[in-house]
From Swiss-Prot:
GO molecular function: toxin activity
Signal peptide: 1-23
Family note: Belongs to the non-disulfide-bridged peptide (NDBP) superfamily. Short antimicrobial peptide (group 4) family.
Protein name, per record: Non-disulfide-bridged peptide 5.6
Isomerase found in the keyword field: no
GO biological process: killing of cells of another organism; monoatomic ion transport
Role of this protein: Antibacterial peptide with activity against both Gram-positive and Gram-negative bacteria probably by forming pores in the cell membrane. Also has weak hemolytic activity. Does not show antifungal activity.
Length: 68
């Protein structure tokens, strides 16, 4: 149990460290490039990936049977 708690705490710390470093890199990039250039970045370019599900009707029936 102690090992699981320690691993969980380490995972939370590493995820926090990752998010802070990502924010630092983006802030540094914003300072180098300029705020006007970053406003034109198209952050919605990945929305097309999630428009239509790739699961067929047969797969949905199988999953419904599996989860009963």
């Amino acid at each position: 149990m102690k090992t699981q708690v320690i691993i969980f705490i380490m995972a939370v710390v590493f995820l926090q460290l990752l998010s802070q470093s990502e924010a630092f890199i983006f802030d540094l990039l914003k300072k180098l490039v300029g705020k006007r250039e970053l406003r034109n970045i198209d952050l919605d370019q990945f929305d097309d990936m999630f428009d239509e599900p790739e699961i067929s009707a047969a797969d949905m029936r199988f999953l419904q049977e599996l989860l009963k």
